[in-house]
A protein has these predicted regions:
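Conserved hydrophobic residue
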Residues: 50, 74, 263-264, 379, ...
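Short runs of predominantly hydrophobic/aromatic residues within well-ordered alpha helices
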Residues: 37, 84, 88, 234-237, ...
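Charged, flexible cofactor/metal-binding loops and thiol motifs
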Residues: 117, 121-124, 128, 143, ...
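Generic, well-ordered alpha-helical scaffold segments in large soluble proteins
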Residues: 40, 61-68, 90, 94, ...
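A helix-coil-helix interface module used to build multimeric assemblies
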Residues: 1-201, 206-213, 274-275, 290, ...
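Short, well-ordered beta-strand elements within core beta-sheets of diverse protein domains
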Residues: 42-50, 163-166, 235-243, 368-377
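Glycine-rich cofactor/substrate-binding loops
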Residues: 1-36, 97-98, 279-457
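A generic structural-conservation signal
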Residues: 53-54, 151, 221, 382, ...
């Protein structure tokens, strides 16, 4: 069934139909389309535009269509142009002329705008659940590793000692912001376009506020032309999804590095690893690599959406049909990555002894050694130079700062005393950092309590 054709004298070319149809992908939101139609006819009956008898018949028919699609007895085919015409054709077939009244006071332009918003809202909620699940795993890691010392890095060079809890906490902050972005998008987009018509509203006395309320929106949109052509919320969503993917990619990159024989910080669980067809010894972190690789795919969706929108005049244009496949793919990709990443991280084994040894052997306590001198009256710039000389001495003798004798310390500066060893121990270096946001256990415990309250809110 076509929703148009009265003014045409020729049948649609099959190639044109194949190129023009969207049901092969917009069938994904058949549930949202039916939900929108149920709300629409409920409002029409309330306003006296539709009889209660027709309303009840239409709603019953729509629910039966949804049920039959759900259980597989009704197959969606590409004979229809889109999911809207498929549902309407099946409705008319089931209930007769009453079904022809479904589209009263409505255009496919505001209908698809509604469907896309309903679908996007549902997917934001599902993505948020996955993000929350990841945060719960990261929070458990933080609680269990408050005293797991490791090197912190700048320029991929060992810099200062931190804890695994603190390092994981940095990613917690990223994914925490991601949840905030999704919530912000959901709030801003939560206005109902239904009732905007093709672009100029309708002459029917629709109650748009009532329809918006039925569908869980905060209210109706305020400009009908913008309502049918607005895809800002998709651009914002794709930007947020790209940011989530980027955060997953950064963490995946570190896991790949940590898993290498050169680092040996982590051991991947067998269930989240793959092997080689030729090298029997290989155990590859391919899930982390695929997550890293799929990030570009999500970025591509964002750039495609921006490009689609950049030259479209008001109001609705067929170009907007291109918003769906790329949005669907980006959402599915990020959700899949979140699910796999959470499982991968929750099953990894951290080699705590290797991490602490790496921190000790990388001069990560050099800054604390300089601070020791400053606390004994040496100007910081002079202290910096003194510790630099000690580091050079250690490099030449293949030692860590902790391995130097007191005589060797004093050979560079007489200020050093026996308490230097306690001052540069990994435990002291980390635990004396107690300001909010620092790696010390006391500071971390306060932050963890904040996170717990947020997750349980």
């Amino acid at each position: 069934m076509k929703l148009w054709g009265g003014r045409f004298t020729k049948e649609e070319n099959q190639l044109v139909h194949n190129f023009n149809e969207s049901i092969s992908f917009d069938q994904k939101f058949y549930r949202q389309d039916i939900a929108g139609s149920i709300a629409h006819v409920t409002m029409l009956a309330k306003q006296g535009i539709l009889t209660e008898e027709d309303r009840d018949a239409i709603i019953a028919g729509l629910k039966s269509i949804r049920e039959d699609i759900d259980n597989g007895t009704l197959k969606i085919t590409t004979e229809s142009e889109d999911i809207h015409s498929f549902v309407e054709a099946n409705l008319i077939e089931r209930i007769g002329d009453a079904g022809k009244r479904l589209h009263t006071g409505r255009s496919r332009n505001d209908q698809v705008a509604l469907d896309m918003k309903l679908y996007t809202r549902d997917e934001i909620d599902e993505t948020d659940v996955l993000l929350k699940g990841l945060l719960e795993v990261l929070l458990k890691l933080m609680e269990d590793n408050l005293h797991t010392y490791m090197p912190g890095f700048t320029h991929l060079q060992k810099a200062q000692p931190v804890t695994l809890a603190h390092h994981v906490g940095a990613y917690y902050e990223m994914f925490r912001r991601d949840r905030g972005r999704l919530a912000d998008i959901r709030k801003r987009m939560n206005y109902c376009p239904l009732g905007s018509g093709a672009l100029a509203g309708t002459t029917y006395p629709l109650d748009r506020g009532y329809t918006a309320e039925l569908l869980g929106f905060d209210g109706p949109t305020l400009n009908s032309m913008d309502s049918v052509s607005d895809r800002d919320y998709l651009i914002e969503l794709l930007a947020a999804l790209s940011t989530i993917a980027m955060h997953l990619s950064r963490f995946s990159e570190e896991i790949i590095i940590w898993n290498s024989n050169e680092y040996r910080f982590v051991e991947m669980d067998d269930s989240y690893s793959t092997g080689s067809s030729i090298m029997p010894q290989k155990k590859n972190p391919d899930i982390a690599k695929l997550i890293r690789g799929k990030t570009g795919r999500v970025y591509g969706a964002l750039m495609s959406m921006l490009t689609v929108m950049k030259g479209i005049p008001l109001a609705y244009d067929k170009d907007l049909q291109e918003d769906k496949e790329l949005t669907f793919d980006a959402i599915d990709t990020v959700k899949g990555c979140l699910l796999l990443f959470t499982g991968m991280v929750s099953t990894m084994t951290f080699r705590k002894d290797v991490m602490e040894a790496s921190a000790k052997n990388g001069f990560t306590n050099a800054t604390d050694a300089a601070d020791y001198l400053v606390n004994h009256g040496v100007p910081f710039r002079d202290a910096h130079g003194i510790i630099g000389q000690l580091v050079l001495l250690c490099i030449n003798e293949n030692k860590a700062l902790d391995d130097l004798t007191l005589e060797q310390f004093k050979s560079i500066s007489p200020v050093f005393e026996e308490d230097i060893y306690d001052a540069i121990s990994m435990k002291t270096c980390v635990e004396k950092r107690v300001t909010i946001g620092a790696p010390g256990a006391e500071a971390m415990k306060k932050v963890i309590e904040v996170y717990k309250k947020e997750l349980n809110a």
